[in-house]
Amino acid sequence: MKIKNAQLTKAAGLDKLKQKLAQAGSSDTKSSSEKPTTKVPEKVAKEKVVKKKSVLDSSVPTMAEHVSTETSPRRIRAKNRSSFASEDSTIPSPVSVDTESTAFSPPVVEEVVSPLESAEPEIVEPTPASIVDEPETTIQEPPPPKKEAELVVKKEPPKNVVSIKSNFGPTGKHINHLLAKTFKAPKKEDKPAPKERTGTVQTKPQQSSEVPSDKQHSSNNRQSQPFYRRDTSKRPGSDFRDRSKKDDSPKAFTGRDRYGLNDSSDDDKWRKKRVQKTKKHYDEHSVQRPTHIKVPLPITIKDLAAEMKLKASELIQKMFIHGMTYVVNDVLDNETTVQFIGLEFGCTIDIDSSEQDKLCIESNTVKEEIQETDPSQLIIRPPIVAFMGHVDHGKTTLIDSLRKSNVAAVEAGAITQHMGAFCCSTPVGNITILDTPGHEAFSAMRARGAEVCDIVVLVVAGDEGIKEQTLEAVKHARAANITIVVAINKCDKPNFNADTVYRQLSEINLLPEAWGGTTVTINTSAKTGEGLSELLEMLALQAEVLELKANPEARARGIVIESELHKGLGAVATILVQNGTLHLGEALVFNDCYGKVKTMHNEHNQLMTSASPSVPALITGLSSMPKAGDPFVVVKNEKTAKEIVNARIAGQQKFALQKKRPNFDAMLQNKKILKLIIKADVQGSIEALSSSVLKIVSDKVSAEILSSSVGEISESDIRLAAASKAVIIGFHTGIESHAESLIKNLGVKVHLFNIIYHAVDAVKEMMTALLDPIAEERNLGSAEIKETFKSSQLGTIYGCLVSEGVMTRNQKVRVVRNNEVLWKGNLSSLKRIKEDVKEVKKGLECGILLEGYQNAQVGDILQCYEVIYHPQKL
């Protein structure tokens, strides 16, 4: 092979080497014609490099291997390809081994395809390579002089070159790395410089012969130092020979490994560091807190703190210092409390009532509205009279006599349990009468009746006098500032005594006219009709004095007397118009429901087209059932009514989700709770029954009402009772037909009542049944142990003498020693002269076997007793 680069020859001073190479080239040409084209074995190339080095440095002794050219040497396949290829790409000639010790082999030149297609020769710098071991001897040569040499390299890759098997795949990675994770190319801006393509298979740094492993050093004793071309166009450290060995220690599994973004053979420099979020530090003094704000009521602690630019914890801490315990979601509805909190932080708080003004369609009361009306538009309206008094004092019978009807016969138990509103005609004019219940459970109804009516007729039985509910009715009437007329009823009875009633009235500051006072008193009899005409005249006189007037042309306003759920009509309500006139088809707004009047009936179930002031009516067409006592007002249309009600409900639901605080006192006391579900025919009955149940106070058990609604007992009520283990109380209602079978299947307790005090008594009995009975120990007798006997089968048998009472089998026994109870248990066996007996009387001896106790001694006392359980009281 001819070396065309003259500069390399002159720089290295290889004149003699040039001659040797020329001779070797001629011998190679001859042998190439005889032998097939093969690649030069790497081992032979390494030997030639060693011989070349021996010529350069004669001071180092070399030992060449004498191999004859006649006998062809055994070809050794190289583990890695050489760094240089022969210049002739078509017919590469094999190099023969020189027999002389000073023979040299030319360096193998690797044909490299340059990325720049230029015709100029490329300068290659020869550098010392790693040494390859030979089995015979190991020769170390000093590095050649570091002068650049220029070699001419052909661009055409060699043909018919035997490929060398490698442990690396076409991707350039070891199979272990490919199995571990997939490779994902880096971003364009971070891609490393592309490697130059070579005509032969690329040599990998991990398995390169230039960097031999420890196993290679042990197997091979000779070293070779092939030259390789350094590309100066690449950045420093980009070549695989310049890289240091990476740390093969296992790395932690990260999120990038899951998507194949990490690879052990890749450079980590291209990866971008994750930008860590730095915490923003706020300066408390930099926040400008307002000095004047406007908030609506009610408002939560969280919202108030946001308006004041404060933390909720600061508000809670300040309120706790002043004795107010709140959490972040608690609601503040007191204007004074909100303003006090603002002053503590130097902020003036005003209450914003704009939203409430939109929802409040009535700005004043009915009386104020009438007073502001032009007197020319007012007319005289009938008086509204409420009959109030104690139960069974004859209120309903007296009203029946005035109306000439028989309502009392319809009431269950002959007591009024509903509020009735009637409009009756009398010789003195029309009167609207409200019949309120006299039972103690209907206190809310009596209070509503006192608020609505103009005159209160206090019915007192002449034979019984003033009772508890009578005093309560007086209290309600005085609170509403209503005129009171006393009707002393049952004057036809022989034990009637009006003076006793007068004395009792004077004691409560109702001095009768007969005694010189101002309170009107009339003796009446519902059965004989005595005093009824006088009562009507007195009511008409009081109405003239009060000057009761109303404006029939105004929009209708009034109050709900009673409401119920009808099977065919749905939600119905008994209303009383206080001002204006209610017509069919008008839209109404109640507190939390609305409706459009579809039908209107009077007390005789006759259709009505309008209801004037002081006239009661039964209306239908409501969205839901209003509560008794709710006011109503007529609005423009049903759409407006719906918007107002929805806005009110949304405001209520905003704070309805607030969790109830647990009753820690009840938890500490470990109270038992009776859960109830109440169903009734009307809303007033629910209020009465609920208030009566909640009035049952006990330190050991309490009643809790889970649900209360109007209507029949349905499947949903039964399922709720089964899930919560509650008892259903039905008052003046029934059970749906398809729900009766469900009651038996789920085992739910259902109690139906028509009289309210029967329902209250039943609830008391159920609450008492929840209490654990009190255990009482009653002594039956005692016996002294005189002797003990050991039995292998039964244990210890005690021979006793009954000293007091009777010892009975299958009773409880106490073992007493020195007035101290050692054990309590059952007496399992009792014998008298080897015979089982039920009892042994005083003065007799017996054998006793205790169940589970063998440690009694002679002289101990066995006390026989029985346990008696007594029910607790509320």
Swiss-Prot record:
Bias kind Low complexity: ranges: 105-118
Q: Where in this protein does the record put region G5?
A: 525-527
What ranges does the record list as Basic residues composition bias?
Answer: 271-280
Molecular function, one GO term: translation initiation factor activity
What are the start and end residues of every segment in region (Disordered)?
Answer: 1-289
The protein's matches in SUPFAM superfamilies, at most eight in alphabetical order, are given as: Initiation factor IF2/eIF5b, domain 3 (SSF52156), P-loop containing nucleoside triphosphate hydrolases (SSF52540), Translation proteins (SSF50447)
Q: Which sites bind GTP?
A: 389-396, 435-439, 489-492
What the protein does comes down to: One of the essential components for the initiation of protein synthesis. Protects formylmethionyl-tRNA from spontaneous hydrolysis and promotes its binding to the 30S ribosomal subunits. Also involved in the hydrolysis of GTP during the formation of the 70S ribosomal complex.
| Name of the featured protein | Translation initiation factor IF-2
Q: Identify the species of origin.
A: Chlamydia abortus (strain DSM 27085 / S26/3)
